[in-house]
Amino acid sequence: VSYSFNSDLANGSESRSGNGSISELYLGGAWSPVKGLSVGANFSYMFGTLEHSTAIVGTSTSVFYRMMEVRDWNVHIGAQYAIDINRKNRVVLGATYTPKKTFRGNTIGTFYDAANDTKIDTAFQCNMKGNYEQPNTYGVGISYNHGTKLFAEVDFTYQDWANAKYTPMTGFEPVKVKFDNRWKVSGGLQFIPDDRGNYLKRINYRLGAFYNHDYLNVLGNNVRDYGVTCGFGFPALGSKSLVNLGFEWKHRVSSPTCL
């Protein structure tokens, strides 16, 4: 989570920001029942903290702060099927699914009124189980290989956040907190001129792009971001390792109002 928005009010302004992440430790396995087909699953333990704050500045200043501590398990399942067109050309189709589930952990809300020099007070606290949910997540992708020279891939991910349960904090948020369904499409390719040629021809050249419709809905505005990436994989002298260098340009916008 990483965002920051500002909007004008009749007698002041409102700013919202958030940061944090949820990490996962994985244990996975896979099985190939028939040639070309692979199925597998990852079981993981999730842990991390998400922080959100809202500051209202006017004749007085009030700060609302929410922290969510997640400690939970998760499961991801997937399958892929490889089609060998000939000796050099291969197409791989893949799909993934992460089921909807309730989060386990705790959430705490605090409030501070600068005008009255109010002490920071815990105004809301609850167990996340049964109050906050992770949505269903679906993913599909297709990739193409031409020997070791060319690799290209396109992926699509969809999460139905609009149907995920989210219990608002009393006094902190509207009775109904709205999320948008999230979807993202991304693609990339890697090109190696000649993996047996001179040094410049053995460099990995990479290019990609993405478009993301986020689940955030801020004051009725949809949030989305898009960007391009490029990178290089430089062969390390005397070994088969690569030294990777990458760049990314990203732009985040909201509509219909620019925040």
Feature locations, PLM:
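Outer-membrane beta-barrel porins/channels
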Residues: 1-259
